[in-house]
């Protein structure tokens, strides 16, 4: 827990600032505690290099902005977290980066049609938040690589416990570590991991990595750092200029959560499936979406990419639409209303009026069923007894 580091000589310090030696020169860029925790996540994902950020939003922003600039274009799945959609569709457009959104179940031709000469990456979520659409990773990776660009995937909902996305062709993975990894709603955080498999020098699309960086006396990241080029640039350039580094104490709390990740994820999945089976047969429930259910449209993809479990999130609709959904929330006794997933408590929310509130009526109509039909999300972690039954049976 320190911002500053001592050096034996000015020469040692100079070599650090010139990136000629490894070490630490300010905690806005790197910290030993943070690096240790990032290393654990990198090992979990099977990557070559990783870094922590102060939030999942920061991780997704850095992952894209590290290789894209004004005048560039990104292809993204349309089934992504509302905050990420707003980041891409509003904030990053202000920076001059354009986005085209395609359905997560788009075929290769549809994905290809979204590409432009200035496309720099493809983005998606392993399991979308909150609609639970599963990205056909191999299909998106195939089209991305055919066009000489990387596939970036947010693996927050699946975690590396349930899906090792690099095995399916993903090049860069991001996480909101706030969720399952930290697991106790005690600290915000994010992470980025590089698979080391993408060749940044195969074309001229990534000059930030393959041409000299004058802010470091002309160093070229791909020449100096090889497979570590992408994470090194994000650390020493973006962190230097933009910040977004979590405190060492936040990294410590994340580390505590990581030690029980494999146990908690298994319990999340076990409970979620039990609740999903209960809800699908309840007379007051209009529909249930949970890919582990055999009759779910996403089940085949779940079997392929997530054979050990999906996640602890369920989406469902209460008959009667939004008004009925609000009554259900008001009647909850065990679960709490919260805009968070995957901590030690069971939570429910109405996405259209909370996490996806920024979407307009037209966007909501075009969105997933959970945003149109009074959808709710539950995140069971404790015993499943009484989670929703009392709330559904209340007369209120």
Where are these regions (language model features)?
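N-terminal glycine-rich anion-binding loops that anchor highly charged ligand groups
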Residues: 2-14, 371-380
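Glycine-rich beta-alpha junction loops
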Residues: 3-8, 196-197, 258-260, 275, ...
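Conserved N-terminal alpha-helix of the aminotransferase class I/II PLP-enzyme fold
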Residues: 7-61, 83-91
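Glycine-centered tight turns that cap/initiate beta-strands
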Residues: 46, 118, 281-287
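PLP-dependent enzyme catalytic core of the Aspartate aminotransferase-like
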Residues: 48, 89-90, 98-99, 113, ...
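Conserved PLP-enzyme active-site core in the AAT-like
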Residues: 51-281
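Conserved C-terminal alpha-helix-loop-beta "cap" of PLP-dependent enzymes
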Residues: 284-360, 366
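Active-site-adjacent structural elements in enzyme catalytic cores
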Residues: 361-396
């Amino acid at each position: 827990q320190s911002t500053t580091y001592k050096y034996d000589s000015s020469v040692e310090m100079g070599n650090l600032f010139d990136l000629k030696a490894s070490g630490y020169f300010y905690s806005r860029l790197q910290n030993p505690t943070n690096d240790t925790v990032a290393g654990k996540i990198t090992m979990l994902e099977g990557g070559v290099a990783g870094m922590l950020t102060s939030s999942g939003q920061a991780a997704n922003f850095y992952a894209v902005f590290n290789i894209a600039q004004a005048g560039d274009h990104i292809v993204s799945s349309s089934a992504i977290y509302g905050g990420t959609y707003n980041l891409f569709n509003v904030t990053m457009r202000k920076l001059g980066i354009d986005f085209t959104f395609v359905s997560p179940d788009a075929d290769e031709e549809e994905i290809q049609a979204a590409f432009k000469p200035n496309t720099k990456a493809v983005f998606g979520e392993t399991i979308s938040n909150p609609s639970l659409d599963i990205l056909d990773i191999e299909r998106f990776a195939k089209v991305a690589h055919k066009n000489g660009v990387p596939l970036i995937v947010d693996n927050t909902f699946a975690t590396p416990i349930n899906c090792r996305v690099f095995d399916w062709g993903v090049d860069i993975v991001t996480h909101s570590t706030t969720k399952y990894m930290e697991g106790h709603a005690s600290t915000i955080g994010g992470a980025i991991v590089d698979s080391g498999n993408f060749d940044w020098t195969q074309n001229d699309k990534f000059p930030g990595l393959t041409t000299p960086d004058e802010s470091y006396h002309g160093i070229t990241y791909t020449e100096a750092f090889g497979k570590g080029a992408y994470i090194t640039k994000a650390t020493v350039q973006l962190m230097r200029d933009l910040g977004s580094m979590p405190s060492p104490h936040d990294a410590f709390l994340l580390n505590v959560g990581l030690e029980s990740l494999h146990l908690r994820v298994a319990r999340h999945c076990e409970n979620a499936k039990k609740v999903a089976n209960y809800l699908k047969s309840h007379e007051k429930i209009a529909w249930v979406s949970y890919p582990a259910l055999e009759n779910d449209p996403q089940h085949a993809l779940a079997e392929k990419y997530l054979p050990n479990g999906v996640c602890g999130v369920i989406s469902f609709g209460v008959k009667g639409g939004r008004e009925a959904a609000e009554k259900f929330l008001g009647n909850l006794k065990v679960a709490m209303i919260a805009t968070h997933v995957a901590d030690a408590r069971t939570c429910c929310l109405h996405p259209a009026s909370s996490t996806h509130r920024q979407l307009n009526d037209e966007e909501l109509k075009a969105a997933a069923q959970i945003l149109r039909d009074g959808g709710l999300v539950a995140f069971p972690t404790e015993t499943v007894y009484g989670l929703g039954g009392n709330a559904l049976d209340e007369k209120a």
